[in-house]
Amino acid sequence: STTASAIATLAITALLLGGCAAVEGSSDADAGTTGSQKNQDGSSTTSDVVQIPEGDITVEVFTASDLDPSVGPIIQDTLLAAGELWGLYWPVEYWVMGLDPEAGQELVEQYCERRDKAGQFDYSDCMDREAGDEQHSMISYQRQGAEALAGGQPYGTAGRNGDANWGLHRFASTIPWGLTGYFDLPGEEDIKTVFHEYWHAVQHSFIQTLDRDQRDELMGPVWFVEGGAEYMAQIGRAALRAEGKLPEVPAGSWPFEFEEQMSYKLFGIDDGFSGDCEGRELTSITEYSDPCSSLGYDAGAWAIAYLLDQTAGKTLLADFYPTLEEKGWQQAFEDFAGMSLAEFNDGFSKFIEKTTPERLAILPSF
């Protein structure tokens, strides 16, 4: 059978930062309307805004039975650390697949039993979706990990896959290679991934509407969504590691250091903007369907670093996100940045042409 780490409970009032208010919706949810509605995953919701569960906020990690028992507590401790740093807004479920198909199937069954018991999703319908071939189904994370191992490539993925209609942040992940000793990768990479995914929860948590189109618009362009998650994950992990607040993980065969990681991103930016995406500008990378959307991660991370350098004294948590739903993304961004989006794009374009030492100079030290 699958294993689940113990539930860790924290009071929400102790952790909310900067007067944060809203909770997030899911990209899985259809446009919200008052009354009962059907969501893309087959479940139903009865409100047009996210409903925060009463009581304390729980953080739960569920791991497939073929994973080492240490994996769940490490991820849970990391999520709790991220929650202390950025705020814990509403319940978190983090589901982690291994490599074994049977163990993966058992984890899907556990997930669907949980949904059915809570009255959120019929067990049979849940199994049809999550054990099937749909994109982002739970079992797809097991399959991707197994395929990566068979091919000798340490590919991995994780995602925040909902669920606003249930009032929780739900994540799924392929096997964390560094935490499990495969390919001799540093466990810090997996820690960073957890931070990256949790920042997506933070982003969603300031949006109350369940209207899917409105949520997508309020989240902002790809470079901001993914760049923000990547940069905040990098600095969040580095800061808490320096303070001794993160669990110990396998070192792997090479060090995972903040400045080095940001340097690698500069190589990716320089290559990307001189290759197939030559002539593109940062603010043109708005959609995941864009062939250049992968640049949104590296260029976006540096854009957020540049933004925070230009707005010294401000933070996204205190000064941007609390105004987001009222103002809309672009107005909130321009008010935060103190300049128009076009002016920001021009400034970033000039900044990114600087030498590597000049670019690295804006980064914090840990």
What are these regions (language model features)?
Residues 1-7:
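Bacterial N-terminal signal peptides that target proteins for export
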Residues 50-69, 174-180, 285, 327-330:
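Acidic/histidine-rich, surface-exposed loop or edge segments in extracytoplasmic proteins
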Residues 8-18:
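Bacterial N-terminal signal peptides
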Residues 31-63:
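N-terminal low-complexity, Pro/Thr/Ser-rich intrinsically disordered segments
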Residues 20-31:
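Bacterial lipoprotein signal-peptidase II cleavage site
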Residues 63-158, 191, 195-198, 205, ...:
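Zn2+-dependent metallopeptidase catalytic core
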Residues 150-262:
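Zinc-dependent metallopeptidase catalytic helix centered on the HExxH motif
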Residues 214-298, 310, 320-366:
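Acidic/His/Gly-enriched intrinsically disordered linker/tail segments
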